[in-house]
Structures are given as C-alpha cells and as structure tokens.
Amino acid sequence: MTESSPDNRAQIDWLQHQWVIAGVVASAARFVPIPFFDDAIRTQCRRFVVARTLAASGSSLSTASLKPLYGESGGLVATSLRAIARAPLKLILFPVRKIVLIATSIHGVPMEIMKTVLLGRTLRRQLASGTIDPGRAKAMRLALEDAFARMDFHTLRAAITDSLRGARSWKASAIASARSLSRRPLASEEAMPADDQIELTATRVQKVLDRPETAKLFEEFDRRFDQAYAARSTGAPR
C-alpha cells in the first residue's frame, strides 16, 4: 500500500488528527495553576502520540522503549532523583513560570501543537523507512529539537492561532481533558479524552496543516531533521 493510496491517506489523516488532539490538550495544561501539571500532561500527551503511531504502523516496539521521545531517559531511580532535586527550585519559580506561560500562550499554544504533530510525523517517517533502534531514541529527540529550532514557523503559528480563535470554548474543554489525564494515565490502547469541542478544534487545526504551504514547510522540517539526526548519530558537527 503506497502513501498516496486512499486507504493509507485516510490512515495518515486519522493519525494526524490524533496528534493534533494530543497537542491541543498538552497546550491547555499551561492554563492550570498547579505545580508540575503542564510537564506531566505534556509527557502523557507525547507518550500517547508515540503509542498511537507505533500501533498504527504495526510496529512491535514497545512505547516504553522509545521513552526519550516523550519523557526523561534513564532508569526509574535516576529519573526520580533528578525530579526530587529539581522540585524545590521549580516550586519557587512556579508562579513566575506560570505567568510567563499564560502571557505567551498566543505563541506557546500553536508551537506546542506543532511540536506534538511533528513528533508523530517524524516517528511515522522513521518507522516507514525501516526498523528503529530504541538506543537512538535520544538522538532522535535531540534532532527533533535541533530541526525545530532552525525552522521559521511564524506564518504557520499565526494560521493555527487564527483557527483556534474560531473555535469557541476549546480551552475549557482541553483543560477538562488535561485534568482527566492527570487523574488517570491512559492505557496504550485508549483514546485521548476529547469532547465534541476538542474534535471540532482539532479539525480546524488540521485544515491548516493540510494546506499546500504547510506541506512544503513540513517537508523542509523533514530535511533538516534528517540532517540533524545523521549528525547526532555519527557525532559529526551540526
């Protein structure tokens, strides 16, 4: 089945819709005044993207084997110790950090959606090209960050912001979904909690992503990711 076949195109569209929903929910966590909430929800949403993409691609890899793509790498003890060490400083800075997140939401929300979608897109591309070595997951994450930092997403960011303005009450619905996630993490086969308003919002955002100019922009991102990933994998200068 080729990527341009109707069945495969429909699967890609469905998968991208799931990525957008996850990005919308992740972006709304910044509006909840609870310490560590946004980090935890972002991790869960990105884990969902990885799990959904692996399942849709028919991969035998476990979600946990690609943990560097959505959370901190390393063992449970090491991860817990790092979190404990950072907790006091994060609590002290929480009020300032939260104010900044809310004040910059007009930029931060669409950027969070884009990052979530590009995580899924890149993982799907890598799975389509062959087997992924879980040992290179951290290099993949760093290459994603490298490529994203080198892109000019101003026009796309503005278009996504406009699409969100046209969706009423998306923020309240997304916050409710984020709170639901915080109470009970998703099992790997579960869908992201999304009501009709979130579905509508995701559909509006997806129309922006389906534009020809967005496709060209994402192709450029793919090229830059491939370069960064190759450099990260070989240790060559970027």
Task: Give names to the regions the model predicted.
Residues 24-32, 37, 77-84, 88:
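Membrane-active amphipathic alpha-helices enriched in small hydrophobic residues
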Residues 1-26, 44-78, 92-95, 102-238:
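Terminal, membrane-proximal amphipathic helices
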Residues 36-45:
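Transmembrane alpha-helix/helix-exit interface in multi-pass inner-membrane proteins
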